Structures are given as structure tokens and as C-alpha cells.
Amino acid sequence: LESSPKIQQAIGKLKMALELNAREIEPLCVELQRLIRKTRVPDYLLSELDSALVENLAGVRTFVVRSSSNAEDLAGFSAAGIYESYNHVTSAEKIVESVKEVWASLVSARSVRLRQQAGISLDDCFMGVVIQEQVKADFGGVMVTTNPMNRNDFRNVYINVSPNVTDVVEGSKQPMQYLYSTVEGGGRTVSLGDAKEDLDAEGHAQLQRLAVVGRLLQ
């Protein structure tokens, strides 16, 4: 993004509009996203991306292109669902397009407004991109191995999970909430969220194994 004078100029206009709390914030975000999508990625960066894919993901046919911003998972600001990630990406061209879409999601009108309300400056926000192999899964979600409200509390592992692999990270539905106690050595479903029924015994066993692995990795 720093290589494009037009993008830098648009970022400057957006910063000024945010300082003035101007009405033009939304159209400025839309224009900035358009510029990011249409601007060609520099050759050196394309070369680095290609080398990294060959070195780490050779032979992979289907990819996930995920957002990874420093302006998420913060105290008082989770940013769940406001940045874009893309599944079922199957070509080099689509990978590059998805990377630009992830970058553009940092300056969507919604994400900019929510960060402004949380007191997070645009100057302090950056977006990384994680490219992974897409694998078949029975369910997906987010696991936290420390109490989010108390980092010194390691007694429980918290898992938000959904039978639809992408629901939790997209923030599109309320997930099941599962709690595993490392003190008691057992787990339970705290909330079903939008699900109509709980996971079966094998599903619970998988979550317990996952919680133990997460704690060991920690």
C-alpha cells in the first residue's frame, strides 16, 4: 500500500475526515477500497509470495486466505467478523485477489467506524495476511487457552465452535460455547448459541482432546 501515491493520498483524506468526524468517511472508505483492489501488487512482492507458497505449500490445491490484524482481539475490542477472510481459493490469481480484499477490509466503513468508536487510530492499524491449506473439518471455531478477562487464570480452556467451519471467525452466527477445566479434567457445553442441538459424544471428545493439546502447546 505504501508503494501507491494514490492510496497514500486517499488514506490521508480518510485520516483528516476521521479527525473532523466528517460525513465523507463512508465514501472515502469505499474509494480507498476500490483503489486497493485495482492497484497492481509490486513485482517483488508477487515474487516473495510465490516463493513462500512453493516453499511452504507446494502441492496444495485449495487455500484459505485469512486476515490477521493488530487491531483485533484487544481488551474491549474483539473485531470479530469485521475483517475479511476467503475460503476455497484455488489459483494463484485468486490468491492475489483475496490478499487485496483482505487488505481492503482494514478500511471498510464498518471497521473504520468501529475502531473509531473504540478509540483506535488508523495510524495504529495494520493488516497481515495468512495463507493456509484448506482442510476438511467437522467443525471450526476459536480456542482460547487463558481466561480472556484474567490472563493469570489458566484453569479453563474456552472454545467457541460451530458445525459450519467458517461461522465463528466470520461472526455470522452465535457459536456454541464449550468450557474445559484442566483442574477437573472434564468439559461441558455452556451455550448452544444458534445451534439447535449439542454436539454428540464424539464431538465432545474431539473438543476435549483439542483443549488438552492447546494447553500443552501453551
Model segments located where?
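Beta-strand scaffold of nucleotide-dependent catalytic cores
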Residues: 66, 77, 86-88, 98-99, ...
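Conserved catalytic alpha/beta cores of large enzymes that bind or transform nucleotide phosphates
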Residues: 157-218
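N-terminal beta-alpha lobe that positions the nucleotide/phosphoryl donor
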Residues: 1-130, 139, 205, 218
